[in-house]
C-alpha cells in the first residue's frame, strides 16, 4: 500500500503505509484535494 506524506505544501513524498493508508490519504486529501488528485 502507498501512503502520501508531505513535509511541506510544495514537497510531496510517497511511502509504504500498510497500517494507516486510509488515515494518511484522508489527511492529505483534507490538506490539498487538488494535489491529492494530481498524485493519483
Curated annotation (Swiss-Prot):
Tissue-by-tissue expression: Expressed by the venom gland.
Listed GO cellular component terms? extracellular region
Q: Which InterPro entries match?
A: Snake_3FTx, Snake_toxin-like_sf, Toxin_cobra-type
Q: Give TM segment ranges.
A: none
**How would you describe the post-translational modification of this protein?**
Contains 4 disulfide bonds.
Query: According to its UniProt record, where is this protein mainly located?
Result: secreted
Report the subcellular localization. Secreted
A molecular function (GO) held by this record is: toxin activity
- The cysteines joined by S-S bonds are 3-24
Alphabetical keyword list: Disulfide bond, G-protein coupled acetylcholine receptor impairing toxin, G-protein coupled receptor impairing toxin, Neurotoxin, Postsynaptic neurotoxin, Secreted, Toxin
Q: How does it assemble?
A: Monomer.
**Its job:** Binds irreversibly and specifically to M1 (CHRM1) muscarinic acetylcholine receptors, blocking further binding of antagonists and preventing the action of agonists.
Q: Which family does it belong to?
A: Belongs to the three-finger toxin family. Short-chain subfamily. Aminergic toxin sub-subfamily.
Protein's UniProt name = Muscarinic m1-toxin4
Amino acid at each position: 500500500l502507498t501512503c502520501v506524506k508531505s513535509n511541506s505544501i510544495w514537497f510531496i513524498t510517497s511511502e509504504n503505509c500498510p497500517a494507516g493508508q486510509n488515515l494518511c490519504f484522508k489527511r492529505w486529501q483534507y490538506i490539498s484535494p487538488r494535489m491529492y488528485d494530481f498524485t493519483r
